[in-house]
Amino acid sequence: MKTNSEELTVFVQVVESGSFSRAAEQLAMANSAVSRIVKRLEEKLGVNLLNRTTRQLSLTEEGAQYFRRAQRILQEMAAAETEMLAVHEIPQGVLRVDSAMPMVLHLLAPLATKFNERYPHIRLSLVSSEGYINLIERKVDIALRAGELDDSGLRARHLFDSRFRVIASPEYLAKHGTPQSAEELAGHQCLGFTEPGSLNTWAVLDAQGNPYKISPHFTASSGEILRSLCLSGCGIACLSDFLVDNDIAEGKLIPLLAEQTSDKTHPFNAVYYSDKAVNLRLRVFLDFLVEELGNNLCG
């Protein structure tokens, strides 16, 4: 008996989802049907593909080898089908996009109308999360994140690079004075992140050339909240340029310690599961973001 594409699809979905129940939900199948198909596949192959416990699933050595091949086969099948249909296909359907709130407000929302005019049959669903998420569990097609890619199960498309700006409002500086060095920040009300703590080591360099670690007077979980605190005169913040450049241009915020601030950039990427790469609505959205953000954000 030969293995069929349904068996490959179900097996790969079980592994990527981490459970039979989540795979069944993703595939719109009964739990019993998913379990039965995987068992049938194991019987055909004559090996156990999964270690089953009451708490979690894990791949056997044979299962890991088979999963890699099955995943590639399904990707090639989907790519071949998409290529045949792409000539006549119109991008359509719901595209679920997750990003931190500052990116939603300052990058995605301003581009939504232009994207809708170009692709009127795609319905964007924008949700906000500050940390890393499980795309499958959250039913998200694509996430926009800062930093390097850690999860080998994901693919990334580079969108743009950003630099940090140390900024404060004119009102704050008029009241508290303007720091002339990283060390002088110790005498000011610095605005920092609740977590991760690494974001409270700023890009401004001290006399020894080391990034300066602040002791925050106020903390918040989002860069957007810190921006609001900064605009209201609560203190000094260090935020990504795309978040504050308009405020600087309008005179609402003043850049500080420019000569002591590192010009090192940090990347922003779109991340998604590799089997989504052939999804036409995802592909055109990625191309759109690269075109718009790559051209308009110079870091």
Swiss-Prot record:
Gene Ontology BP annotations:
DNA-templated transcription
Keyword match DNA-binding = yes
Phenotype upon knockout is: Inactivation of the gene provokes a dramatic reduction in bacterial adhesion to epithelial cells. The mutant is unable to undergo intimate adhesion to epithelial cells or to provoke effacing of microvilli on infected cells.
- Cystines in this chain: none
Q: Which domain of life is it from?
A: Bacteria
One Gene Ontology MF term: sequence-specific DNA binding
Write down the DNA-binding region ranges.
Answer: 20-39
Q: Which UniProt keywords apply?
A: DNA-binding, Repressor, Transcription, Transcription regulation, Virulence
**Matching Pfam families:** HTH_1, LysR_substrate
Induction profile: Expression is transiently induced upon contact with target cells. Negatively autoregulated.
Gene3D superfamilies, from UniProt?
Answer: Periplasmic binding protein-like II, Winged helix-like DNA-binding domain superfamily/Winged helix DNA-binding domain
Question: PROSITE patterns attached here?
Answer: HTH_LYSR
**HTH lysR-type domain spans which residues?**
1-60
- Subunit organization: Forms oligomers. Oligomerization is required for DNA binding.
User: Which family is this protein grouped under?
Assistant: Belongs to the LysR transcriptional regulatory family.
The Swiss-Prot or TrEMBL note on domains reads: The N-terminal region is directly involved in DNA binding through a helix-turn-helix motif. The C-terminal region is also involved in DNA binding, probably by permitting the oligomerization of the protein. The C-terminal region interacts with RNA polymerase.
Function as written in the Swiss-Prot or TrEMBL entry:
Involved in the regulation of bacterial adhesion to host epithelial cells. May play a central regulatory role in meningococcal adhesion, particularly in switching from initial adhesion to intimate adhesion by downregulating the bacterial surface structures that hinder this adhesion. During intimate adhesion, negatively regulates the expression of pilC1, encoding a pilus-associated protein, pilE, encoding the pilin, and sia genes, encoding the capsule. Also negatively regulates its own expression. May also regulate other genes that are involved in intimate adhesion.
For this entry, the protein name equals HTH-type transcriptional regulator CrgA
- Its gene is crgA
